[in-house]
Amino acid sequence: MDRSDKKVNVEEVNVPSNLQIELEKSGTSSSVSLRSPTKSSATNLAGMAEGARDNASIASSSVDSLNMLLERQRVRQLNHPQHQQHISSSLAKTPTTTSSFCSSGSSKNKVKETNRISLTYDPVSKRKVLNTYEIIKELGHGQHGKVKLARDILSKQLVAIKIVDRHEKKQRKFFTFIKSSKISENDKIKREIAIMKKCHHKHVVQLIEVLDDLKSRKIYLVLEYCSRGEVKWCPPDCMESDAKGPSLLSFQETREILRGVVLGLEYLHYQGIIHRDIKPANLLISGDGTVKISDFGVSLAASSTNSSDSSESLDELELAKTVGTPAFFAPEMCLGEDAFTRYNLTKENLFRGSCISFMIDIWAVGVTLYCLLFGMLPFFSDFELKLFEKIVNDPLKFPTFKEIQSNKVSKVSCEEEYEMAKDLLLKLLEKNPQKRMTIPAIKKHPFVSWDFDHVPENDEKLLSSVLEQKLRFQCNQTDQFEPISISKHELKNAVSGVGKKIKESVLKSIPLKDPSDLSNKNYLHPTETTRGRGDANVIVSEGSVLSNIKELSANDGCLNTDSDTNININDDDHYSGDDNDGHLTKRELERELNKFDDKHEAGNMVNLPINSSFASLDSFYIDNFAMARMGMSSPEAGDSVSSVPNLPSAPSSTRLGRSPVFSGVTNQPSPIRPVLPQQKSSFCATGRYDKSHNSLLRNSSSHLTSYNSGRPSSRTGRMNSRNQNLPKIPNSLSKISTTKLTELRVPKDSEIPSPAKNPNADRLRRFPVKKNTKTPAIKDPPRININSSDKSGSKNSPIKSLYQRMKQSKDNSKTFEVRRGNFFSHFNGDDDDSSSQSSVTSSGSESDSELSSTSSSCTSGTQSRNSSNNNAYSETESLPFEFGVDSEDGSGVLLRDLPNEDQIRPFLDIQPCRRMKVKSSLNLEPPSVSSSSSSSSDEDELILNVGTAGHRRRHNSSKLSELSNSPQKGSNNFMYSNGSVHDSETTITPQNMDDLTLHQALSRSQPISKPGPLVLPKRLDQKKATTETSNLTDIVEFNGNNDHRKDKNFDKVLYSRDLLKDALSSTNAGRRRSIPSNKIRGRKDASITMSTNVGNDEHARNTSCHGDKGQENGAIKQRTHERSRSLTVAELNEEKRRSALP
């Protein structure tokens, strides 16, 4: 009983799972009792039967759906709507093993059409991926485009991708004899695609897929790859026209190639296609030695003449009469219309009166056979017209049998074989196309079947196999082919960019979801195509995950793309199978894609635009583009704004420590404050703190605040002149009381309000924030030179006090707004009465040495004279943005930005004029530089405002001329450019003496090594001869002082002045006299006074002593104090006579 129970259990396992489930649901006792044991044994074996049902279900489903899984996987990789319907219907009718092979063959013959191209590139491994094809190398390039070797990622199949231009390149039409009716490149592409879509034969190169994106200027034809390349018949270093033999192939190899070409050509002629360019270069050999015909660019679909488009086809036929290779032209093509009279041709037997027929391919086969046998062309010439004449008139010539037998390549067996080869060539290269050999006659020729007929009779197995091959070759293949028809409409719509196929299909269907909405982690987006109802085929892209495209009802006619994954697979096809079949297929495809991703790092892949630059896959700057894209979105770079699509990323650092527009590096500590990057609070784009960002986002130039009046933030040396005319900031924005400064604190994260008014706040990424972040104070910030000897200045250091306040106010936070705008504007924020802003400021006292040195070099704005007594100079709001609390660019503060009195300036560096304590006998109060100096400056003249009077001093004045030409004992304290030319034609104009007072005082106290003003006058612009001179003696006397009075050259200077007077008076005696001199200034006791300020009366009192001390020289001193005027010769002689008297 136990054995029988076991046998019954074995029988239960063999029951199909679907039938077993139905039997259990039905509950019919009669059917169950036939295969179930007795009641007593059934209770004992209930657990065993339950476990066996699961095993039976899995085993039966695996066996029955093995072929279905393969077919379903192939179906999901197709991309044309008609293919899905065709395969689904064939599988639904006969879901058997034989039908699956048939459908696989039919699906293999179908050409995929893709109108969405995705190109990615890995700059590290130099790997390019076009949709699902990985580009390996270049196979070659020719007239119509390049050919690339690629590998299908899913099927691991090697393919050849032919890249052709969508539009014909513009050519020069000058001095050319090209007919306007010549076939265009675009028509060749359309013709080739339309023909290859219909042709599916063993000896014809298979078109696998057409990648045709309207955005790209290139069309990619994915072709079958022939690993052994084209047929070679001459040495590679020799041109075809210069080849003289022998051939590179033997007679037997040539015979096998000929048989493959004849079979492929027979198929094409049966389909009504004239190849028109049969030659060895268009014959490719696959890895197994199969010969395949390629390049249908100039082919002619002759079957279209029977359609309604016959008139249009006739025009197309006339356009394509003389295309191809001239050396392989048939005689009727060379003659044209004369061929009808010469060969007595009837137009009814040809194509609508044209000389084009199938016979031109037969002639080309004969020329190809001649090249393969003898290694040279039958007719050749350097000129095309002479070549045509030879093709029509010259007889065919052959080398002798001894020459062929002597070479070690041909390997001809006997002379009879050679004669058979000559006979075949004579029949193929018949001048008259009506007498030329046909394809059935070629197949039965003795030379073609020579190896079939000369097999040793001893080997019966070999004999039987060879006989079978001969019968298969010589049989008529027309019964095995299905005729195709290529109409004019199909030629136009062969390329989707030319016809209306996309526009028509879009009206009937809804395309897939736009790839831009998908995840950015996948670098190859799924190919989007026009789809009909019931279509669930997609082209799988690299790195994509296949799962669950669920088809909607037939009434909806669209796909469900709402799942989380990128690509969905239809699990509800027209197949009757188990539910786990689709999941098995999904796992297999995912496994293949995961292997591919593991082998190649997908993180380095960069999407390339499909344009004219990168579409050829050979751009010279593809690496630069890819590296730039990787640098923008690289996670290693620490770019915090990379996730925000609307914010452009910027480099992490710029030159000279200046801050970029967007702060990109957040993890690298700044040199000025190595602990501050740990803070989690930062400024938003509005200028306020935001706890949700850990990086500092600067406003771009298009989002400037009102403080800079729309001016861009520049860091160049022209900032001083660019920001001179900025409007004055209101007092309410620039004034901050001292009590407010003491309450100024770094805000806590909890007290920071969120920028609700910022429209871009929702698009910015939020980061977690650590509460109560402590920031230790920095005692000695790096790269800041603070004079330790000056204790009073160190207490008021703006940078140091800023960190001290940060340390003291970490518990009492208050929100404040950093003032944006000009880098140099309002450093101290304490200017109330200045109407302009200057970058050249001066410090007015000794107690503010450190602050004054800082403001004189790197700050701007209008600093008041009592800035040393004001404690509000280092407030945080008035600091520039780079010195803010959360500035990410502390390296912007360099040593040259914070100078002190002992700083060593660069060689010959022009520094601004500074207020200094003048220690001289004059006891002059040094006037300060007015804040309006820069606003009143001009490009044509250099003006230095001295004193509060605001007198202007031109560098081409007489005082500078005298200073530059007069000899001095000590080192010259001023530097003058070489462009200043002082000659007799220079206009000399008298000026006030207050200008000279300042320079003279500065010259005594400031040697060249000390930081002082270096005056460089410009080239004199006015060079006009005149008799008006200045009171040169007054200038020399005043400028000389005691040192110059003791100089031996003092008299020489006075004497040279007299000579100048004589020269001017003698040569220009008839000119207009000058204005009468001032008699008051002519007196000896005359004093030089200043008319501008009461505080400068001391100048007049101190300078009056020069007139009293000048009594020693008598009459000479009296003449020098007189105002200069034009003198006659008589007056000069009289003065000389008087001076000569004792």
UniProtKB/Swiss-Prot annotation:
Ranges of residues in domain Protein kinase: 133-448
Alphabetized UniProt keyword annotations: ATP-binding, Cytoplasm, Kinase, Nucleotide-binding, Phosphoprotein, Serine/threonine-protein kinase, Transferase
Protein location: Cytoplasm
A GO term for molecular function: protein kinase activity
Residues found modified as Phosphoserine: S964, S1126
Ranges of biased composition (kind: Polar residues): 82-93, 640-656, 707-741, 785-799, 958-971
Residues carrying Phosphothreonine: T43
Catalytic residues of the enzyme: D277
Reported modifications of this chain: Autophosphorylated.
SMART domains cross-referenced by the UniProt entry: S_TKc
Binding-site positions, ATP: L139, G140, H141, G142, Q143, H144, G145, K146, V147, K162
InterPro entries cross-referenced by the UniProt entry: Kinase-like_dom_sf, Prot_kinase_dom, Protein_kinase_ATP_BS, Ser/Thr_kinase_AS
Bias (Basic and acidic residues) ranges: 742-751, 1096-1111, 1133-1142
Annotated Low complexity bias: 94-107, 694-706, 835-868, 920-936
Region (Disordered): 22-41, 82-107, 634-678, 694-799, 825-875, 919-971, 1005-1027, 1066-1142
Reactions catalysed, as given in the entry: L-seryl-[protein] + ATP = O-phospho-L-seryl-[protein] + ADP + H(+); L-threonyl-[protein] + ATP = O-phospho-L-threonyl-[protein] + ADP + H(+)
Function of the molecule: Serine/threonine-protein kinase that phosphorylates SNF1, the catalytic subunit of the SNF1 kinase complex. Acts as an activator of the SNF1 kinase complex and controls its nuclear localization upon glucose and nitrogen depletion. Also required for SNF1 kinase activation under other stress conditions like alkaline pH or presence of cadmium.
Family statement drawn from the similarity comment of this UniProt entry: Belongs to the protein kinase superfamily. Ser/Thr protein kinase family.
Subunit and interaction comment: Associates with the SNF1 kinase complex. Interacts with SNF1 and REG1.
Anything else known: Present with 752 molecules/cell in log phase SD medium.
UniProt-recorded name of the protein: SNF1-activating kinase 1
Organism for this UniProt entry: Saccharomyces cerevisiae (strain ATCC 204508 / S288c)
